[in-house]
Amino acid sequence: MKKTLFLLVLFSFVFAAAGVWAGGQQDAESEDEQSNLIYIITPSHDNPFFKTEAVAAEDEAEKLGYQTRVLSHDDDANLQDQQFGNAIAAGAAAIICDNAGADASIGPIRRAKEAGIPTFLIDREINETGLAVSQIVSNNYQGAVIGGEKFVELMGESGKYVELVGKESDTNAGIRSKGYHEVIDQYPDLEMVARQSANWSQTEAYSKMESIIQANPDIKGVICGNDTMAMGAMAALKTADMGDVIVVGFDGSNDVRDSILAGDIKATVLQTCAYNARLAVQQADKYIKTGSTGAPEKQLTDCVLIDKANADKLDNFVLSE
Amino acid sequence: MVHKALSYIIHTFILMICLLIAGSCTVVRHDQQTESEEDELSIYFDNGEFDAKLYVESVWEEAVLPRIKEEAVEAEVLFESLNSDPSTAIEKYGYRIEVTAPYNFMVKGSAIITQANVKSAAATISIDANGPDGKPVEIQIGPVIKGTAVRDSMDFIHFEDFTNQLEFANISREMNNHIKATILASLKREELVGAKIRYLGAFQWVEGEGVLITPVDLVVEE
């Protein structure tokens, strides 16, 4: 049933694409007009982070006079392959993508390039240069380091703690974990008693945290690879009457902002995802019009620490001055 | 008109055949993850091909130190300038690697150590200098050294020259390790307060915050 539905969806996409393609062909015959369609492909919009970057990219593209097609690959590299295929078939002007894997995404980006369609990556980078026109990379490592430093400070440099890691297939899960440990492991009195993946999920973080608490009732802190897991962990801790345990997240969502303001979660790390998405669209526009973005392919944007001091200035992943 | 309709039908027909072929193939997922044991999450992104330590050793004497020696501004001049006219100071002395990052400054000076903050593993010494906005000025003495001020002051180290952000991050880590091993290892940590020092280093400046210098040279004068 699922497969049938999937095929139906696929069919409809391809036909839609075919329509645009055929239309494009006819236009090309008549007046050699350029494509005006930008594909925006990101992970699932269930996570407000990805929704924000998709909406920002869409808004910026429409402001610049483009039509958009917004898709989610749900961190499935095969689905991403098909979506790139659609964009190629549709003769898109550009693809804006938060990719589904540092290695798995190399193939489709190369095919798009060969078909003359430039790709602009946001948030996550790929392990190859010379394929995408821009890689506007959120410096997750730097973000994890400042989050880790805040966590160490809140812990008073000692005590037992737990780490909740994100989805393993996601590059940033590894990068953030490595950044945290780069800092925390330099402090001999901080002891990690459990380290588990909760796959970026709030419910999974809740249930994993519940069982971790059973075995380790004396934990002092929990450091999480993203905000949804931090929310899950905080909820489990509060249920167990352990609301004073230090929880630190990553992303800068409004949920965690509110939790920080309420005194529950202590800190998170903001990625400037809306800024990055708009920058990518602006560079795509410039590239389409002039053949160059004027910027290097790989561009790094820093993350910002959010705690009680600045949480009230945060809204939808944008920190007001 | 007839020609266009015909072309449309032919395109659709070709696509349908393609789909039939595609439909008969088995789609194999290539992003499958093997379940790993607790505490053994693999970080495949870091393939270990790049030796950051070797890289830092190769540029330290030839490029890092010469640049900081050349570009460093006398502390009193720099702090006064940041205090009175930050935008001019930034334009004149600041360097940053990208638009969302804070500016880095290279600095040198002589000072008296007023306090040794050695309770934390990220230990620092406070010096008798007036930071911008009257904020304190500290120098990191480790063992934990925070930040990436030294790497980010280098105009010859560009993110795009490295495979990914981990390699880029490892450069900063190895620079800080190099500083610990060469400059800070011989520091007599019990006899710091009251001592006169000469220092050379870099810091990342955020307006309204104190100055935290990562030293690349630190000499206690007899």
Where are these regions (language model features)?
Chain B
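Sec-dependent bacterial lipoprotein signal peptides
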Residues: 1-25
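OB-fold and OB-like single-stranded nucleic-acid-recognition modules
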Residues: 25-222
